[in-house]
A protein has these predicted regions:
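Short, small-residue-biased leader/transition segments that mark boundaries at the very start
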Residues: 1-7
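Phosphate/ATP-binding catalytic cores across multiple sugar-kinase/actin-like superfamilies
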Residues: 9-30, 134-138, 142, 235, ...
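Structural preference for long, well-ordered alpha-helical segments in enzyme cores
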Residues: 13-18, 36, 40-45, 87, ...
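ATP-dependent adenylation/pyrophosphate-handling site
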Residues: 29-31, 36-82
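Short beta-strand segments
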Residues: 30-33, 57-62, 97-99, 143-147, ...
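A conserved beta-strand->alpha-helix junction
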Residues: 54-64, 75-115, 202-206
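Adenosyl-5′-phosphate
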Residues: 124, 141-143, 175-379
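A mobile, often basic/glycine-rich helix-loop segment
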Residues: 152-177
Length: 379
């Protein structure tokens, strides 16, 4: 009975949150990746539009050359192309697939840095900026599925406890990835590590739990506490910065405080029923989505797998390193940089950031220093 009540209440909260966000006196659309979260919102939106005799517009995003070069990973088990197109047809929406050219994703790195006022999430930022500009040509408001994973438990660290019980945040895979590229003595790596570790332990200690929480429930609360306090806020800032820099308003119904307050107290066994992540949301939406989408494995916002992108960014970065006015050339350990280029491309942050994104971040960092006239003492 408890499970059935949770499912019913959750369904009502999500539908109400979404319908509230559909109110708009300007053209509105939804982002539709074909994943669970965006599909739930698009399905509710499409139904609401049909009630008014209208058709909802939806958008999915892909990259030039991604189909030919896609590589499966723990965080990105499949691409979005097939699912988004298929669901758009199933929902009978006015669906548009936007494809980002490789050169545009690289070219937008500078604008993405300006939009954030600091180096950010590399092409994960620049591609969203490009897509938002394209969407703005037809629509003024969009709805996106952010915040669901942080609340319902969509990330691996929710159901893999070993990712939580270590010295730093579970989405940081290599805390030294950027520091080791700098000249020896410029920064103290141990000091930086101690800061990250101290902050992480402080947040762990600040998580609200109950004395009678089971181990799994306590783990669920900690993962939610960390994800909403850090990971979600980072994604929301990214969304706000890139969209508003494009004069596009993007709304996030899953960020409704009522949803977080309710789901935070739902037993983990209900949220992870049958060892399925976000089982509560899936069960609540069984008659809203087809099986193909309802049980699709989580896949994050897409990144480019096209090797031409890494080469493009590397060429751009080398030009900046060759410039006499760049900061990065003065602080970079060139031997460490060459070793990084010769090594395998491993994920060092989040779900998507590997070597191409590290190169793009370095480019953003150097551009940021130029844009805001940053100076370093004693270099």
């Amino acid at each position: 009975v408890g499970s059935e009540m949770c499912i019913r209440d959750r369904r009502e909260l999500v539908e109400d949150a979404m319908r509230r966000q559909l109110v708009s006196d300007v053209p509105l659309c939804t982002f539709l990746s074909g994943g669970l979260d965006s599909s739930v919102l698009s399905a509710i939106g499409a139904a609401a539009y049909r009630e008014q005799g209208e058709t909802l517009s939806t958008y999915s995003f892909e990259y030039e050359g991604n189909r030919e070069n896609f590589h499966q990973s723990l965080f990105q088990p499949q691409g979005d192309d097939e699912y988004a197109r298929w669901l758009g047809q199933w929902l009978k929406t006015d669906h548009t697939v936007l494809t980002a050219p490789t050169e545009e994703v690289a070219r937008c790195l500078e604008a993405a840095t300006a939009a954030r006022d600091m180096p950010g999430q590399a092409d994960v930022d620049s591609s969203l900026l490009y897509f938002c500009r394209r969407v703005k040509a037809r629509h003024t408001v969009a709805i996106s599925g952010e915040c669901s994973d942080e609340i319902f438990g969509g990330y691996p660290w929710f159901y893999r406890p070993e990712m939580l019980y270590r010295d730093f945040f579970p989405w940081i895979h290599d805390p030294y990835a950027r520091i080791r590229l700098l000249k020896h003595g410029l920064l103290d790596p141990d000091e930086g590590y101690a800061y990250i570790s101290g902050l992480y332990k402080k947040w762990l200690a600040g998580c609200d739990t109950l004395e009678d929480d089971s181990d799994s429930m306590r783990q669920s609360r900690i993962a939610t506490h960390l994800s909403t306090g850090f990971f979600m806020t980072s994604l929301l800032e990214r969304k706000d910065r890139m969209s508003m820099y494009s004069s596009l308003e993007v709304r996030v119904p899953f960020a409704d405080h009522r949803i977080l307050e309710y789901v935070y107290n739902v037993p983990w066994e209900i949220k992870f029923e049958n060892q399925v992540e976000k089982a509560l949301l899936r069960n609540a939406m069984q008659d809203v989505l087809p099986e193909k989408i309802l049980h699709r494995k989580k896949s994050p916002y897409p990144k480019t797998h096209n090797p031409a992108y890494e080469q493009e960014v590397l060429d751009m970065l080398r030009r900046r390193l060759a410039s006499p006015c760049g900061i990065l050339a003065q602080i970079m350990d060139t031997e460490a940089f060459d070793r990084m280029l010769a090594s395998d491309s491993e994920t060092w942050f989040g779900q998507l950031m590997s070597r191409p994104q590290l190169l793009a971040w370095l480019y953003q960092f150097d551009y940021f220093c130029e844009l805001y006239k940053v100076e370093f003492e004693d270099i």
